[in-house]
């Protein structure tokens, strides 16, 4: 028998509608959360809603890597101890957080904001690939090469840390074609991750090893 909802309050139903619009939250879970909020002290609920308002209205995106940040430049890009000649390309902010949790990567990032997915109407222009190409071009500018020579002459590297499914591989190949002309090293994660696995669901040990043992990207 189908689950039928009968709400004693229109306001409660509207709250359930809003909460259930979140990914992974069904209507029963949304109802449970809404009823829980009703039991909380008013100041707790105000703190909860204020945090969401501030997140939506005040969070910024780093002008270099597109990571979410409280400032125009995120804490990773502003860290001079990081290797700014190594850029790890990821699909989402969550991927950055997962890689950082491994403690195995010390470069910077570039968040694409998705992957190429024709079936979902997402093309290269819908992602931050153009900004990535500009960053890579900057790595081989005379000024950047002179600075790198003073720091040991390390070759610039782009790590394609995208999922191994068809869409992820398509995106990696497209990016490779866009940046190959600049002569930077292009690598991808070692395939400790299964085909189609997302970084979000990889355990820290497996993900860390995939980064350390990364391989030259073979188009």
Which residues does each predicted region cover?
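Extended interfacial segments that mediate partner engagement and assembly in macromolecular machines
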Residues: 30, 79-162
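Conserved, well-folded catalytic cores of nucleic-acid-processing
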Residues: 18, 22, 40, 55-58, ...
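Alpha-helix N-cap/helix-start motif
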Residues: 45, 121-122, 168
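Cys/His-rich Zn2+-binding cysteine-cluster or related metal-binding knuckle/ribbon modules and their
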Residues: 3-12, 21, 31-96
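Solvent-exposed alpha-helical segments within well-ordered globular domains of core cellular machineries
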Residues: 13-17, 31-35, 46, 50, ...
């Amino acid at each position: 028998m189908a689950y039928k909802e009968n709400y004693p309050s229109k306001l409660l139903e509207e709250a359930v509608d809003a909460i259930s619009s979140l990914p992974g939250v069904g209507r029963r879970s949304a109802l449970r959360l809404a009823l829980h909020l009703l039991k909380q002290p008013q100041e707790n609920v105000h703190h909860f809603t204020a945090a969401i308002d501030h997140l939506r209205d005040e969070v910024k995106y780093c002008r270099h890597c597109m990571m979410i940040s409280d400032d125009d430049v995120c804490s990773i890009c502003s860290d001079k101890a990081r290797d700014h000649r190594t850029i790890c390309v990821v699909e989402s902010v969550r991927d950055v957080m997962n890689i950082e949790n491994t403690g195995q990567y010390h470069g910077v990032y570039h968040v694409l904001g998705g992957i190429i997915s024709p079936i979902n109407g997402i093309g290269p222009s819908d992602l931050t690939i153009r900004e990535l190409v500009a960053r890579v071009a900057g790595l081989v500018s005379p000024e950047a090469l002179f600075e790198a020579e003073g720091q040991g002459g390390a070759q610039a590297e782009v790590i394609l840390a995208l999922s191994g499914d068809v869409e992820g591989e398509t995106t990696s190949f497209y990016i490779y074609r866009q940046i190959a002309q600049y002569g930077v090293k292009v690598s991808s994660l070692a395939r400790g991750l299964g085909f189609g696995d997302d970084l979000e669901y990889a355990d820290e040990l497996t993900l860390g090893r995939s980064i350390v043992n990364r391989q030259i990207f073979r188009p």
